[in-house]
Amino acid sequence: MSKKVLIADDEPNIVISLEFLMKREGHAVSVARDGPSALEAIRTAKPDLVLLDVMMPGLSGFEVCQAVRGDEALAGVKILMLSAKGRDTDIAKGLGVGADAYMTKPFSTKELAEKVRELLAS
């Protein structure tokens, strides 16, 4: 069954790669290129999963995640944060604001696909 996945990232090459991978996995994909448009897309489309970059213009991934977790209507949306920031404090902050999982860039597409399947199955 096809799931709705929102890719929220401002880096074009990452978006192309993630979009290809998620479509290959059979998901319906939409894209947001900054924090405010990501939040708007989450509120209107209610995706099953958001691949959320931490460092984006307008609002950070942390701020977007916090806003989503503060909205009961969006409780079912899974969030996988993606970031080049891999320090323990960054990971703890991402999970602390409500992300379901956190992966650091660069990541293997195999690991990402497995994590997405795991999150969508739960």
Predicted region positions:
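Active-site beta3 strand of CheY-like receiver
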Residues: A45-L51
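C-terminal output helix
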Residues: F107-V116
